[in-house]
């Protein structure tokens, strides 16, 4: 690729980044139930539920793996159905019931499956 073409591509990428950073993004208010507890949060229209759970709500038990819904690392239950959180928008959780690995724990401690994950360093599972 010629230097002029490379410079043009770099400028185009810089311009895209600049536009993304200056365009205000409307936030969506969402009310949902997570592991039996009511939650309310703000998210943008493109934010994944995985990102909301981890970055906004601090529920880091749900892991990011492939970001394509194939690996299962981000699996949650949404209204009782197993789904990859990386493929669900945060706004889609409005009025729905979410279950995460944090909700599996028992009052007496870790669920036996959680304990095995811990014992065998199955951190992405």
Residue ranges, per PLM feature:
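Signature of N-terminal electron-transfer/Fe-S-associated modules in redox systems
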Residues: 15-125
């Amino acid at each position: 690729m010629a230097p002029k073409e490379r410079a043009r591509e770099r400028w185009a990428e810089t311009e895209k980044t600049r536009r993304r950073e200056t365009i205000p993004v409307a936030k969506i208010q969402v009310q949902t139930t997570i592991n039996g507890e009511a939650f309310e949060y703000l998210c943008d229209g493109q934010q994944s539920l995985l990102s909301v759970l981890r970055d906004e709500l601090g529920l880091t038990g749900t892991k990011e793996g492939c970001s394509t819904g194939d690996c299962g690392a981000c699996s949650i239950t949404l209204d009782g159905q197993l789904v990859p959180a990386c493929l669900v928008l945060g706004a889609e959780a409005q009025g729905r019931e979410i279950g995460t690995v944090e909700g599996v724990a028992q009052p007496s401690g870790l669920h036996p499956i959680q304990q095995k994950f811990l014992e065998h360093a199955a951190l992405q599972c």
